[in-house]
Amino acid sequence: MTRLWREQNLALVGLRGIFPVWKVASNELIQEFISAKFGSVVCCTNDAYLDESFVGKTIDADFVASLPADVDPCGENGEFHSFAFAGPIFKESVKFQVGEKVYRPLEETHPAVASTVCPAPGARRTKGFWFCDLLPA
């Protein structure tokens, strides 16, 4: 998604976007995130990029090193989503445990959905997503 798209959609609801890390390299951002002692866990992966084994992993240096070369270390292209549970801005860490992992295939019955998951020739194709439950500890 482009910055213009975001600005236009925010304007529709009377908001103005501020983008302090726009165009900062993801490799730099993830190293800063890890160095600052933030804790984050992967709660969803796009199966076109990452398999079930990545769901439930803590984002740390080992996680970043294990990513395929074409996966953004911050998940900026939709490769994965995460939940931040600890860090210097948290009053206290969120206690949780990783629960069940489930796979949800995409249902391409609506033209609007199908058009968003049909990549350019040669690009990876998303068939579904892996999720994990994050349960109170």
Where in this protein do the model-derived segments appear?
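Nucleotide-activated chemistry modules centered on ATP-dependent adenylation/adenylyltransferase
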Residues: M1-A137
